[in-house]
Amino acid sequence: MYTPTYENAFKLLLKRAPFYAYMLVRIPKIIDLENKFPYPAAVAISGGRVVLHWNEQWMAKETPEQQAATLEHELLHIAWKHLTRGRGKNRLLWNYATDMAINCHVKGLPDDVIYPHMFNLPENMTAEWYYEQLLEQAEKNGGKLKIQIEIKNHPWNQPGQNGSGNNQEGE
């Protein structure tokens, strides 16, 4: 069952970038209607297959453009093979690194996403390059990352998630 929010994001993205049609129709989707999934959207490997998670309540708060951009962001994780290239890496740092690599290329994302400039890093580098830079920064700062601006409501910065629970440093 697809929700109107997901369907609208799907249609808007396909209108803007039909390239994604093949990926979107082939990927199994898990639509969370009860806000149990701790992120707005994500891709994961489940049972050997890539699955798209969509948190309906969270995404319903975003504009249609932000919803479509979020969907594009998740599809780029798949296209750029971020799910398999990150094996053996620190999960939080790899998430930050892959998000920075993608977010430079996607227009219309929600305001609370991560960009390279937040870590004094240049745009348009690979996820591996960002990962090494973040790892180096964390090692220099006793395991903490220094983010340049506050990221309100980012799922990694919520208590009980993968972050430290404040909006300025990640673990």
Regions flagged by a language model, labelled:
Residues M1-A69, L75-E171:
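Short, functionally important secondary-structure microenvironments
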